[in-house]
Each structure stands twice: as C-alpha cells, then as structure tokens.
Curated annotation (Swiss-Prot):
Protein name: Uncharacterized protein TP_0415
Originating organism: Treponema pallidum (strain Nichols)
Highest taxon in the source lineage: Bacteria
C-alpha cells in the first residue's frame, strides 16, 4: 500500500443526513490529491477513506471519547490532532500515525507527551471538497453508511457554512456519486 504524508483532520461534524465534514487538511498536495480522486475515481463513486473514531483517552491525551477525530485516506500517513478546542496535549505541529487500512482495526497513536490514544477506523467516502478562508485550509466532505450522493455533500456544505458563517466558501466541488 502506498504511503502518503498529510495533515490530519481537526474537526468532524456529523449531520442527520449521514454526511460528516472533515477539516484542516494541509493544503500542500492535499488539494491536488483530493481533486485527482474526484476525477480518477469518478466511475467508482469517489475515494474510500477511513474515519478515525476515538475509543478512549489514555494518559494525558485530552480528547473526549465520544468525539470523532478526522480521516485518513487509504494509503495515507496522517495526523490525529483532536477536535474543537480540545487538542491532544495542546499540539500545533504535525506528527505521523500509520494506518494499515483495515476496517475496524484498532491502532495506537503515540502522543507528544508520551500518551497513547486508541482509535478505530471505519470506512467513509469522499463526496466533495472545498477551499475556504484561512491559511491553506481544505474542507473535505465525507459520507458514511452509503450516503455518498452529490445532494448529501451539498447539504453537508450548507450545514457547515451555517454553523461557521464567518468562514467564506471560496470554491466547492462535488465528486460524482
């Protein structure tokens, strides 16, 4: 499996329509990576990714167990950085955690203070991505439970922008369902 380096998602917001929103993917290489998946995976309905679900906090990693932590595309290396105001040990820099790409597999991620966080992976599917205001931020819209239609992606985008109206959407692309 190919390995790729990339920043992890900092935020995951779940919506009633079954679509989740991922955010803060490092823009260097990530935009082209996602765009190529929208194009190359057109016939297959988009890239398969893994949602990173927090199982429990261990040691000093301050992340609520019920929060969702982000995404890692199949074959990527990425970073789990927490959600909202709660950050893992207050980190601002990127560190790597390797994902083997097996659904339901639990892997351990070493924290900056020596803590370890247990998470599990679930399949999801990128349905669209958008460029937003801020220093190099790519927002990724990822559907789960088969809800990977263009309409679901648009609903997710609308819900996201409604919650954060100060973040202006510069562009948005919906991957073919």
């Amino acid at each position: 499996m190919r390995s790729r380096k990339g920043r992890g998602a900092r935020r995951w917001m779940s919506h009633e329509n079954g679509v989740a929103v991922h955010g803060n993917v490092g823009v260097e290489g990530a935009r082209k990576f996602l765009e190529s998946r929208c194009v190359l995976k057109e016939a297959e309905g988009g890239e398969i990714c893994w949602s990173v679900i927090v199982e429990k906090k261990v040691d000093d990693i301050r992340v609520k167990g019920e929060q969702h932590g982000g995404f890692l595309c199949a074959g990527m290396w990425g970073d789990f950085v927490g959600t909202g105001e709660e950050r893992i040990a207050g980190r601002d820099r990127t560190e790597e955690a390797h994902v083997t790409g097996k659904e339901g597999k639990v892997f351990r991620r070493q924290g900056v203070e020596g803590g370890t966080l247990r998470v599990r992976l679930e399949k999801c599917r990128i349905v669209g991505w958008g460029m937003y205001g801020g220093p190099g931020v790519v927002r990724v819209f990822c559907a789960r439970s088969g809800a990977h239609s263009a309409l679901s992606a648009k609903r997710a985008q609308a819900a996201y922008l409604a919650m954060w109206p100060s973040i202006g959407c510069i562009s948005f692309r919906v991957c073919p369902a």
